[in-house]
Amino acid sequence: MTQDDKKTPGQFSRRRFIAGSAVLGGSMMMPGFMNSVWAAGTDAPEKKEIRVGFIPLTDCSSVVMAAVKKFDEKYGIKIIPSKESSWASVRDKLVSGELDAAHVLYGLVYGLQLGVSGPQHDMAMLMSLNNNGQAITLSNQLKQAGVTDAASLKKMVDASAKGTYTFAQTFPTGTHAMWLYYWLANAGIHPFNDVRNVVVPPPQMVVNMKIGNMSGYCVGEPWNQRAIQDDIGFTAATSQEIWPDHPEKILGTTSAWVAANPNAARALTAAVLDASRWIDTSDANRTETAQVVAARAYINTPVATIQGRMLGDYENGLGKKWKDAHSMRFFNDGAVNYPYLSDGMWFLTQHKRWGLLDKDPDYLAVAKKINRIDVYKQAATAVGGINLPSGDMRSSTLMDGKVWDGSNPAEYANSFAMKR
């Protein structure tokens, strides 16, 4: 947990975990016994084979490793990872039922719930997959012109005609769009009025920058490190600089799928949660994970492109190297994975800020509908030894000093000087 989170209502408590272990299932069961009941008894998963979509990004790792390391078998299921080409493809296949669940952008699921990022569908968020590990890359052409950070970019944008520079993100309601907009706005650059912004699928970012289609982009790893290795760009900011330990990808599905497959949803969540804990247990496990997901079937990039930042070893392409205290995390003693209502609500505040929503929704009601805390708690009990927080909100301080704790989302959404 970050320093900001340590004294919040969402603080993790081992005592709370013990008291809350018998969630929504009657009496407490030992993890091994619970798993055998799920696999063979009345709580057996309704589906044995579960197709889970993913985009080639480092943060798909827990889904992939749940299958590769056979955590899925412990819970009576078989996860079939399905590599997808874009977030739009993930969206379409989720709502059509071609995918059972997916490694997906937090904001994509919330956008679907409100009919913003496609036709309205009731959605479900089963768990958070990771914190941190995204970045904003700027082109070497900008570097050669003297741009090395947000302040120097602001000067160049101000000196040019509006729309001269193009920036890419990965989906209109997604996390990368929100990090990019927040970073630009914090520098005084309006993401819609001062520059152009376009949607590009994550694996296509590097090649599009190489041929000059954009001046910058926001995406997940390894595509920021890849730009440095290919000598076409540099890291201007990491997403954890914008919001330390921010929410990012989630395990998402439709509400209808959970209703039809409650035991399978629980088993899937448990398997991915178990894999998340395994990844974060040691640098050796993280290294093994990098070696697995680098393969052609998954991310299809050199291991070195993934491994460094996965271990917290950063370079920015401008000569600076550092050990990042908030590098990508998959578990962090369970703090990563809990479906905090405030995390989902934050994305809605940014959708409102940037005109994707024309009025304030019932922020809390939407989050309670999507974030399936009940399923997560059941899965956490089955896995065993997973700390649960004492509340469903957490407090964080973002790069501009604003504190977000979910307490007054409408006021927060309308408090920004720069908006659309």
Set out the residue ranges of the language-model regions.
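N-terminal secretory signal peptides
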Residues: 1-12, 31, 38
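Short glycine- and hydrophobic/aromatic-rich loop-to-beta-strand nucleating segment
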Residues: 136-137, 250-253, 257-258
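Secondary-structure end/capping motifs
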Residues: 260-372
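Extracytoplasmic/secreted proteins, especially bacterial periplasmic and envelope-associated proteins
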Residues: 67, 89, 93, 175-179, ...
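N-terminal export leaders
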Residues: 13-30
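Conserved C-terminal helix/tail region of periplasmic/extracytoplasmic solute-binding proteins
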Residues: 345-420
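Short, glycine-/small- and polar/acidic-enriched structural segments
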Residues: 40-199, 208-227, 232-245, 397-411
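Short gly/pro-enriched beta-turn/loop segments at secondary-structure junctions
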Residues: 245-246, 288
